[in-house]
Amino acid sequence: YRKVEPFMSLSKAALNMAEALRPVLVKLIPQKMLSAVKAKVIEKGAKDLEKTEITPFEPQAHKKGINLIGSIKSDTGLGQSMRLVAEILENSTWDYTVYDYFVPPGGSRTNEAFDGKITQTGPYNINLIHVNPSELPLAFMDVGKKQWDTRYNIGYWLWELEEFPKEWLPAFHLLDEVWTPSEFISQNLRKYTDKLVYTLPYSVTAPADAAYDRDYFHLPKDRFLFLMMYDSGSGMVRKNPLGAIEAFKQAFDRENKQVGLVIKMNRSEQSEKDIENIRTKLDGYDNIYFI
């Protein structure tokens, strides 16, 4: 551990400095090169995680409760996922607090639903870490080893592909068990670890705003509509909207006026290539809608 901790501290300092200097760096160095350097730091940190000795769980060392760690304010699917988990805790008998961890600049972060639960400390004996394995080394550097020690550490992960990147395997070392929202993800992760992997689906409530009806989105009122939505930042290959379009085409012909498929892309302005790729697949289907 003594050999690993200095690297973690230096890596965290380097990343923080890089983010502080981002406005200057992006003018001098190509974004692709900056991303590559950051990826190297994360990769080195991930490898060193396997050498880090986490003090085993001591139930009585801290108060009973849950420290929920992740980007609770993020206006993304991952942020909403964390808020759904927080909503479950809010309606349970468990004491909990939120540590708002994110990788700067963090994108749009305007959600204030759980601002009242955010603290800079994690006083409870369970860490529920809503951070995907690709960023877990950064979270470990940011939160610190002390927050991991003597606590029961649970990762809540989302990864919808069957193959799990080998460079992420060291992330398992930091956890006692893993939770996922679907059995598909759980089955895939169990192939890579002997640690417990549980499926805990979301508890979803969906309050509707009457202003945002089908007329608002220029969608037909008299059709059964399927919805496929994703964030361009999550990658087209991973979210697979083209697969949804192909499945719809196989199930229904272009003249079918009883059904429709709605494709909704978040942050579409950041991926014109994705939009063009999707439009080429619409192929004259008037019952496929893009919003």
Roles of regions detected by a PLM:
Residues 176-187, 194-209:
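Donor nucleotide-sugar binding/catalytic pocket of nucleotide-sugar-dependent glycosyltransferases
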Residues 69-70, 156, 181, 200, ...:
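Short hydrophobic "strand-cap" motifs at the C-terminus of beta-strands
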Residues 3-131:
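N-terminal pre-catalytic "stem/leader" segment of glycosyltransferase-like enzymes
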Residues 50-55, 67-69, 100-188:
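Extended catalytic core of nucleotide-activated donor transferases of GT-like folds
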